[in-house]
Amino acid sequence: MPVSIPNREEILADWEAHPMRRPRIQKVTINIGVGESGERLTKAEIMLQRLTGQKPIRRKAKKTNRDFGIRRGEPIAVKVTLRGPKAYEMLKRLLAAVDYKLKASSFDEHGNVCFGIEEHINIPGVEYDPEIGIFGMDVCVTLERPGFRVARRKRKRARIPTRHKLTKEEGMLYMMEEFGVEIVEEEG
């Protein structure tokens, strides 16, 4: 069942009147958690590089877990961060892999959204390579308003006031308006 946003018209009017309040994509992060180092991690790295055209970085285990045979500091995942037009184009392809449907629970209180893709071959334009195999991935989309740089810059750093932060509803509305995403309730 699609989710409706109660104050939809009010938010859209605010974005129209104040362009600095309209959200934008800060970054798209694609993560493949392999759970082991070695050949499988290298294959995931190759696949992610082919998919994004960018060199992935390896993520290391934070803790030792004997049940899974993981040591602290051992590389167990690969990640790519995309920004700008590249992030926008990649997000369109990734959303097509999930049929432009996202769960309402995938959004956090700041309007950011994360979703999973079970098999990378579901992404349009990706061919199956028997040498590499099939990988799933987590996709996190971080949204922001123009002006958020003041919280990250080195000099004259300032806090973002609560009224300028994004809400969950605004994040949902942005994804619906910009990408034509359908937001569904969980069946329970």
Swiss-Prot record:
The keyword Ribosomal protein applies. GO terms for biological process: translation. GO terms for cellular component: ribonucleoprotein complex; ribosome. The keyword Cell cycle does not apply. One of its GO terms (molecular function) is structural constituent of ribosome. Keywords: Ribonucleoprotein, Ribosomal protein, RNA-binding, rRNA-binding, tRNA-binding. Pfam families: Ribosomal_L5 (PF00281), Ribosomal_L5_C (PF00673). This is one of the proteins that bind and probably mediate the attachment of the 5S RNA into the large ribosomal subunit, where it forms part of the central protuberance. In the 70S ribosome it contacts protein S13 of the 30S subunit (bridge B1b), connecting the 2 subunits; this bridge is implicated in subunit movement. May contact the P site tRNA; the 5S rRNA and some of its associated proteins might help stabilize positioning of ribosome-bound tRNAs. Belongs to the universal ribosomal protein uL5 family. Part of the 50S ribosomal subunit; contacts the 5S rRNA and probably tRNA. Forms a bridge to the 30S subunit in the 70S ribosome. This is Large ribosomal subunit protein uL5. It comes from Pyrococcus horikoshii (strain ATCC 700860 / DSM 12428 / JCM 9974 / NBRC 100139 / OT-3). The lineage of its organism: Archaea, Methanobacteriati, Methanobacteriota, Thermococci, Thermococcales. The gene is rpl5.
